[in-house]
Amino acid sequence: MLLPVLRASSRIVMRHSVVFNCIRLQSNKPERSQQINELKLREIIEGTNFGTEATKKRKLEEERKKLEKEREAERQREEKKEREAKLEEANKQNEADFSSTKTGKLKGEDSEVDHKKDEGLRIENKIIATTDSSVDATDIPNIAEEVNETIQKEIGGLPSEKQKKQSALTKKITQYLDSAHDTILTVTRALNDVTGYSAIERLKKSIEEQEEDLKNAKKYVKECKLTYGDAIQKRSHSQREVNELLTRKHNWSPEDLERFTELYRNDHENDVWEKECEKKLEEAELKVDAVQLKLTQLILTRYHEEQIWSDKIRRSSTWGTWVLMGLNVLLFVFATFLVEPWKRKKLVLGFEDKVKTVLVGIAQENDAVLNPIIEKLDQEQKDGSTGHNLEKSGYLTLEDEGGQTTSLPASLDSTSSQPPSAPVLSKEQQGSRILRAKASIKFFILQAQYAIVSSWHRVRVTCVKSYTALTTPSIEFLKLDKVEFGLYTFIISILSCGLGSLATIYCR
């Protein structure tokens, strides 16, 4: 009977000491429930059937994580030291003493680097890497030229080689084309500035940029929608899992407690993340709407500005057409009423001068031929043997209706080798012939002037007759020939085009 009592008392003492030791060991760190600030979560955890096992497991997990963090930090420090050592070694390898040779190339030795590695180093890299004052600055251009020649020989067909091979004429033509191209661009730009099309070009570029912004904004909206959907799905999944854990609250395992604590803590983060995603989505949608509105406004502005520009160009072209028509009319009037009469007058005067010159020449020839004959006849008349001498000379005297005599050849012998002589004319006959020629010339001039005056009179009479025929009520039918019909059609077409253009300009 005493033995069981002693055993029971010893068990009570042992249990009391174990509990006291546990309390003393756990008093150094706060309980898990003290680390949690949320009252609701603390109440849920305190209502479970967990003891000190979960707390110990949590402590072991935290210690393990701390050890892993320390190892990771140590490993990073070692990697950093290795990288620094490699950098120092590379810097030592790059430090070398270079000197120039007769050809201008560089060579150098490094006490810590193998000669084979130094030979593989390119000349241009040596020029950049060296800091030794032994390299002369005057050698660097020669080295650069040699390097450039080496590159051109290795590659070949470079534009610089082709440019060197061009002739002087080709270079001049190229320069002229470049200058002409620049001039054309300058003129085009100036014309666009004058007409206001440069601003429309800038507006078109802004529309293209706005379209690109709209595309990017829509893409960002899609990404925000996907992110927002993922956030909603993640939170709903977390809440579903929390609800499942709460249904079996009194049968939790240590893993369930850790999972519930993690889910409960992440729920607030998920909520914040979901709200942020929703806010970003709303902002992205508002931005899309703003960009879309701005793009629509830019397109409308461009359409309106292009309409104004096209109206301005159309108006300018209309006025240009009218100016050209006016110039053509002025040229037609000038040519018809000034140039053509002057040309006719000049032609008539020239023809008259030519006729006078010809007649004077003929008269001089006749005088040269007839003067010896007249002198001979006068001498024979004085001697009283005019008829006998005329018969001997082969001439006959004829008397016309006016009582004037004319000497003509009596006979023409076809076998005679002598040409027939010209008829003998008196001075009065020669003067009468000259007067007749002048009268014929004056008649021709008067006839030409009459033709001009009569043509203008005929046109005027035709216009008056046409107006009278159109205004007379008794006349019901008109008969036109082809010339009159073509003339009337031309006049009506010009009048209709002019009136239509004036109505179009002043009725806008």
Swiss-Prot record:
GO terms for biological process: inner mitochondrial membrane organization. The keyword tRNA processing does not apply. Residues 59-95, 106-118 have a biased composition (Basic and acidic residues). Residues 506-508 are mitochondrial matrix. Residues 403-419 have a biased composition (Polar residues). Its main location: mitochondrion. It is found in: Mitochondrion inner membrane. Residues 54-118, 400-429 are annotated as: Disordered. The chain crosses the membrane at residues 319-339, 485-505. Residues 49-98, 196-228, 266-301 form a coiled coil. Residues 340-484 are mitochondrial intermembrane. It is a multi-pass membrane protein. Keywords: Coiled coil, Membrane, Mitochondrion, Mitochondrion inner membrane, Transit peptide, Transmembrane, Transmembrane helix. GO terms for cellular component: mitochondrial inner membrane. The keyword Mitochondrion applies. Required for the maintenance of the structure of the mitochondrial inner membrane. Involved in mitochondrial morphology. Causes growth arrest when highly overexpressed. PANTHER family: SENSITIVE TO HIGH EXPRESSION PROTEIN 9, MITOCHONDRIAL (PTHR31961:SF3). Homooligomer. Belongs to the SHE9 family. This is Sensitive to high expression protein 9 homolog, mitochondrial. It comes from Lodderomyces elongisporus (strain ATCC 11503 / CBS 2605 / JCM 1781 / NBRC 1676 / NRRL YB-4239) (Yeast). The gene is SHE9.
